[in-house]
Amino acid sequence: MPLSYPHFRKLLLLDDEAGPLEEELPRLADEDLNRRVAADLNLQLPNVSIPWTHKVGNFTGLYSSTVPAFNPNWSTPSFPDIHLHQDLISKCEQFVGPLTKNELRRLKLVMPARFYPKVTKYFPMDKGIKPYYPEHAVNHYFKTRHYLHTLWKAGILYKRESTRSASFCGSPYSWEQELQHGSTSLNDTKRHGTESLCAQSSGILSRPSAGSAIQSKFQQSRLGLQHKQGQLANGKQGRSGRLRSRVHTPTRWPAGVEPSSTRCVNNLASRSASCFHQSAVREKANPSLSTSKRHTSTGNAVELNPVPPSSVGSQGKGSVLPCWWLQFRDTEPCSDYCLSHIINLLEDWGPCYEHGQHYIRTPRTPARVTGGVFLVDKNPHNTTESRLVVDFSQFSRGTTRVSWPKFAVPNLQSLTNLLSSNLSWLSLDVSAAFYHLPLHPAAMPHLLVGSSGLSRYVARLSSTSRIHDHQHGTLQNLHNSCTRNLYVSLLLLFQTLGRKLHLYSHPIILGFRKIPMGVGLSPFLLAQFTSAICSVVRRAFPHCLAFSYMDDLVLGAKSVQHLESLYTAVTNFLLSVGIHLNTSKTKRWGYSLHFMGYVIGSWGSLPQDHIVHKIKECFRKLPVNRPIDWKVCQRIVGLLGFAAPFTQCGYPALMPLYACITAKQAFVFSPTYKAFLCKQYMNLYPVARQRPGLCQVFADATPTGWGLAIGHQRMRGTFVAPLPIHTAELLAACFARSRSGATLIGTDNSVVLSRKYTSFPWLLGCAANWILRGTSFVYVPSALNPADDPSRGRLGLYRPLLRLPFQPTTGRTSLYADSPSVPSHLPDRVHFASPLHVAWRPP
């Protein structure tokens, strides 16, 4: 007869009418009983041939491809001028006095952040924008390019100008200047007799007014300015002021550098119309565009070969090809859907390329990408805005993967001990938190994103027009890309993007100037940064509480008025160091703080309502007697595991599911097991704050017996059969709790102390979790444990009770500014005879 739910509940001692604990509890450790119950509840892993279920409610499992939804009306979020001040440390010291070593160490980690992986794979530019939405390929291309352009304009990305130079917008940092003044740039050029630079003394090369002067030295490639490979680079001039023929000569002149003034004057003649086929109307209409000639360049049909500008020297050559976009202007329309109709809508399509306000030298940066990008909804609640997903997963894969640094995540009990109080709370929203932290320019070549331009992108998508190397720029294949879909998409995009369509149709390579979200280093750096800032705030306002996890900052104060003044002071401080807060998203919580998915009040912690609702939905849709794919089980366990500490039996109740996931097998929910879990999660108990106190109750055990010391009273008992030592110690702790009702128990067993009951026999783990719920444990060495003698059968000997105070831990929540001293690698005394591994012998 199958085990019914009431019987099962009785077996787990969850009912009040259970027999004496000392008799009932050891039975649950019996392996045979555990095996029979598991078989009865169908918890044995099924090796049946019934097809697995791959979807339960919203949880999808193996072989399922969730098709992401593309929104043609996505708006690109705006990024404020985020610039974390470089004198952050001195500003913090003005605010709070000298910083602690811990705070200094953390702040120095991000000023600037560094990222140098062992191996970086470079992918072709075609892989830059992922073809995530094949139905909306062109729309997705332009929206992604617009997002990247927005990030570049906000100073979050560098734009690769040539192999060894990049430009960016926004305020420069000193380390970006240092790259210019190193021994390899100015000092070398002087040593080799080359001309001095007409650059600003700051070392960052701001854009010169006579923009085109540089273009006699540099020719425009599909990715920006590069040196001409003609006579200038052949080295025959020696030291006569020309460039020397060294391997790295082209890097000596980053884009944006002007040669000496005479050269500048001579080269002014090379200025001409910005794009090959743009008419003179544009210069008359907008003279500023023609003066900043370096905004522009000519391209070619598929933009693969470097193409010189239409300068005086190159016009005579006759073989220069215009940019792919503007080339349509001089061709006959091939159909009603020819792109030339769109190109002829505007006389002035603007520049082919834009350049930043500042230039820096970079390490050698190939015209490749190291990760792909695509767009998704900003979050499940906001589908109107897009979010850029950057896939730098190459750094987390294979033998050369980077092992990311570990950092402390506060556990539930520590969080409750710290934040469960009668304070008033509010939480701050840091806008684009990751993009606050600057990255050293030397890391740029490892974090490259970009695109190969619209012509390549379209050619990849259409099967008819393949790009062959010998076909570059030939008019036969120019119109191959004219399709109805492309025409309609571009026409719609023209209404929102206007002449930027031209700019975005060119190829581009961008490297990260601030830390990107797709790299495992970023969460670590953000956590270090925000915890250091909170530490500074806590020391400045010792009567208040500031705490952070990643970009989630919370402030607590005794009263609402006090909290408001604290909020004003902290906001002003954060703004003064360059941290951007989204004040419209500040949330005032009253006395119940919503943080990290929990509601934390003076009564303790509970999961937030939306999580409880998800759990109810999950049980409603959970099928019984049907094999469920282990990947779905993984997702179910992820949800249930979050709320497990609030249930009677905790994590041990989920152990059968964990076992099936580990074995990668299907799992069948029996009606009894489902009813058991359902009941567990329908009644959630708060996790309470631990209180300090003095330990008066001690427990100890040997494999054959147990002993308790409750105040001055001693008790002992024996087990029917010898048990593993950890199981015996756990039973002794349960007896101590049930006999004394004490919430503070002293034990010498590290496994009981850890409160992880998942490695015990399943039924015992479930029951012990409920009995010991809300119990705090204090470690007492065996030699000093008053319960040691009773456990060995000696009741006559009385060891004096220890004064063993218990202080609740706030765990590794990085709360205190003073970091504990780091222990040396070897402890003072090494115990080789570990009690966990040495078989117990009777005294």
Swiss-Prot record:
Activated by host HSP70 and HSP40 in vitro to be able to bind the epsilon loop of the pgRNA. Because deletion of the RNase H region renders the protein partly chaperone-independent, the chaperones may be needed indirectly to relieve occlusion of the RNA-binding site by this domain. Inhibited by several reverse-transcriptase inhibitors: Lamivudine, Adefovir and Entecavir. Disulfide bonds: none annotated. Residues 178-346 are annotated as: Spacer. Belongs to the hepadnaviridae P protein family. This is Protein P. Coiled coil: none annotated. Mg(2+) binds at D429, D551, D552. Residues 1-177 are annotated as: Terminal protein domain (TP). Keywords: DNA replication, DNA-binding, DNA-directed DNA polymerase, Endonuclease, Host-virus interaction, Hydrolase, Inhibition of host innate immune response by virus, Inhibition of host RLR pathway by virus, Magnesium, Metal-binding, Multifunctional enzyme, Nuclease, Nucleotidyltransferase, RNA-directed DNA polymerase, Transferase, Viral immunoevasion. Terminal protein domain (TP) is hepadnavirus-specific. Spacer domain is highly variable and separates the TP and RT domains. Polymerase/reverse-transcriptase domain (RT) and ribonuclease H domain (RH) are similar to retrovirus reverse transcriptase/RNase H. The polymerase/reverse transcriptase (RT) and ribonuclease H (RH) domains are structured in five subdomains: finger, palm, thumb, connection and RNase H. Within the palm subdomain, the 'primer grip' region is thought to be involved in the positioning of the primer terminus for accommodating the incoming nucleotide. The RH domain stabilizes the association of RT with primer-template. Residues 228-259, 283-314 are annotated as: Disordered. The record marks Y63 as: Priming of reverse-transcription by covalently linking the first nucleotide of the (-)DNA. Its EC number is 2.7.7.7, 2.7.7.49, 3.1.26.4. Multifunctional enzyme that converts the viral RNA genome into dsDNA in viral cytoplasmic capsids. This enzyme displays a DNA polymerase activity that can copy either DNA or RNA templates, and a ribonuclease H (RNase H) activity that cleaves the RNA strand of RNA-DNA heteroduplexes in a partially processive 3'- to 5'-endonucleasic mode. Neo-synthesized pregenomic RNA (pgRNA) are encapsidated together with the P protein, and reverse-transcribed inside the nucleocapsid. Residues 347-690 are annotated as: Polymerase/reverse transcriptase domain (RT). It comes from Hepatitis B virus genotype F2 (isolate Brazil/w4B) (HBV-F).
